[in-house]
A protein has these predicted regions:
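Short, well-ordered coil loops that connect the C-terminus of an alpha-helix to the N-terminus
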Residues: 57, 61, 134, 208-209, ...
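A short, structured active-site edge motif that brings together acidic residues
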Residues: 66-72, 140-145, 215-217
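PAPS-dependent sulfotransferase catalytic core
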Residues: 1-99
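Short secondary-structure boundary/hinge segments and terminal tails
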Residues: 72-74, 194, 219-222
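Anion-recognition interface
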Residues: 77-83, 87-94, 117, 122-128, ...
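PAPS-dependent sulfotransferase catalytic domain
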Residues: 109-212, 231
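PAPS-dependent sulfotransferases, especially Golgi type II membrane carbohydrate sulfotransferases
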Residues: 1-37, 206-270
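Conserved alpha-helical scaffold flanking the Walker A/P-loop in AAA+ ATPase domains
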Residues: 101-105
Length: 270
């Protein structure tokens, strides 16, 4: 299966090849042992790319993919295994030992903390834990109305599909929050509106992270600009983009799951 045919993708392939080449020597001769593995558990369109960029300001952390939306599942050797292989189907099982071996070639093993952000991992925590030791999970959710708007706009999805998808994500995250001991959960709203407090929570959760800088301008993709911007809560603007008809269709599903929304601090919007 062809991954891409664009010029940009071929440039990315050159970058990845050069990165693996340099990592081979630095990891082989200077790499640390006993790494800590940090997995961002976040549904799509919930601010996970922004969170990834913030955490990547730490001098003690390495992200396995610095391009695009920064997801480990999009690296060339694993894209067909993960991204193109029914990522949201829980009955599909990935070869995690092989995936880890590939990711280790991209991580800077001179860093103590090795981080991945792959959205579909919210449904694969149990499998991940079987392969990775010293593991930490940093979970995040976002107002589901804002997430639904992103799914509709970016994926050209129907409100019905987007609403059901968002609810399924919340169900998975509720399970992860309740059953994963070594985990910390935050919300997109907390990250944007009280970033200093969230940064302190994260550093208390994994002290080896050291200092992180949330005051920079970040290039996480959003509907306002493809350029860099300061952290800003975009929920209100996104939710206002939903039409009255779309909102009614969304609420036909959300009204049946009020308790689930309330669990994460969200409520019905009419």
């Amino acid at each position: 299966m062809k991954l891409h045919t664009s010029k940009r993708w071929y440039l990315h392939l050159v970058y990845y090849k050069l990165l693996r080449f340099t990592r081979f020597f630095t990891n082989r001769f200077l790499g640390k042992k006993d790494h800590k593995f940090l997995f961002i558990l976040s549904p799509p369109y919930c601010g996970s790319t922004l969170l990834n960029q913030i955490l990547s300001t730490s001098g003690n952390l390495s992200c396995n993919n610095h391009l695009g939306v920064r997801e480990g599942q999009l690296l060339p050797e694993v894209k067909d295994i993960m991204f193109n292989n029914k990522g949201w189907h829980s009955e599909v099982h990935y070869p995690w030992i092989k995936i880890k071996k590939i990711w280790m070639k991209y991580w800077d093993q001179r860093k103590l903390i090795l981080m991945d952000k792959t959205n579909t991992n919210i449904i694969r925590v149990t499998e991940i834990k079987k392969v990775f030791d010293n593991i930490y999970f940093l979970g995040m959710v976002r107002n589901p109305y804002a997430q639904v708007e992103g799914i509709i706009r970016r994926n050209n999805s129907t409100p019905e599909y987007a609403a059901q998808f968002a609810l399924n994500c919340l169900r998975y995250q509720k399970k992860n929050k309740e059953f994963e001991v070594n985990s910390l959960f935050i919300t997109y709203e907390e990250l944007c509106d009280n970033k200093g407090n969230v940064a302190d929570k994260i550093k208390a959760f994994i002290p080896e992270l050291g200092d992180i800088d949330s005051d920079l301008e970040f290039s996480a993709h959003n509907f306002k600009t493809d350029g860099k911007m300061k952290i800003q809560n975009l929920n209100d603007e996104k939710i206002k983009k939903l039409s009255t008809n779309q909102l009614a269709l969304i609420n036909s599903y959300f009204n049946k799951e009020v308790e689930l929304l309330n669990y994460f601090g969200y409520s019905i919007i009419n």
